[in-house]
Amino acid sequence: MAGNSQRRGAIRKSGTKKGTSVGSGGQRRRGLEGRGPTPPAHMRPNHPAAKRAKAQQRRPARGRTDETETVLGRNPVLECLRAGVPSTALYVALGVEADERLTESVSRAADSGIPILEVPRTDLDRMTANHLHQGIALQVPPYNYAHPDDLLAAALDTPPALLVALDNISDPRNLGAIVRSVAAFGGHGVLIPQRRSASVTAVAWRTSAGAAARMPVARATNLTRALKDWADRGVRVVGLDAGGDTAIDDLDGSDPIVVVVGSEGKGLSRLVRQTCDEVVSVPMAGPTESLNASVAAGVVLAEIARQRRT
């Protein structure tokens, strides 16, 4: 091997002896020394293997629907780590100002054997497309969706069941906000269709403020069929639509309920609407015609929670 002076017969030319190597002394890594195993090459942002992996992810793959996601922000990251969400790497920006959340995140990641990598903030910006990462990001595998039957069974075990189903909701921020509202008002989970729907992406994780780590989300191959199955098991299917014929004031929230939320633009699809036992609306004052889907869902969930407290 060239330059190996220990090899028999090796001769080093005069003047080629290397001088003393000068490095950083480990200053950049000292803050995270002993905090966790070194990530593999494909997880290091500037490593050629990572660049190849990223390029490969951008290519369309036959049958592939979900990719590894990056959860951003101190609250969502900490919630994921507290909930034991499977994670592949924790990235921390160099020189970031630490607080209790960041310190706990690093500690939990180390205890769980999650690789921790300190990177320049500019690298973190590029990794997250300049989203508001607050100096920390957690790489997680695709979300593990629950089965609709399992979601319902768990809800029925702690009656009265309160579930939310989404129809024509394509914005992951709406999904994340609704997941957060379901958790806040004592709901048991969210049901989404497998096609033409927002999924639990990094954007949804962040909008949910980490609630997606503890609130199950199920995927149905056919939303209408899943709702009919739930109805057969004693769950009242209540649609939420601006054109609903029942005012929220007249809604009886004491029974096991699944609230089906339609999009602000399209509302409920025809088949889903026909599956509903009733369709409620939120009365509006003034010129405002409709509410954002996540806001409307929060209003209905708050009303049901109020009724169940009294």
Curated annotation (Swiss-Prot):
S-adenosyl-L-methionine binds at residues 262, 282, 291. This is Uncharacterized tRNA/rRNA methyltransferase MMAR_5079. NCBIfam families: rRNA_methyl_3 (TIGR00186). Keywords: Methyltransferase, S-adenosyl-L-methionine, Transferase. It comes from the Bacteria. It is an enzyme of class 2 (transferase). The keyword S-adenosyl-L-methionine applies. Belongs to the class IV-like SAM-binding methyltransferase superfamily. RNA methyltransferase TrmH family. One of its GO terms (molecular function) is RNA binding. Its EC number is 2.1.1.-. One of its GO terms (cellular component) is cytosol. InterPro entries: Alpha/beta_knot_MTases (IPR029028), Ribosomal_eL30-like_sf (IPR029064), rRNA_MeTrfase_TrmH (IPR004441), SpoU_MeTrfase (IPR001537), SpoU_subst-bd (IPR013123), tRNA_m1G_MTases_N (IPR029026). Residues 1-70 are annotated as: Disordered. Residues 49-62 have a biased composition (Basic residues). GO terms for biological process: methylation; RNA processing. Pfam families: SpoU_methylase, SpoU_sub_bind.
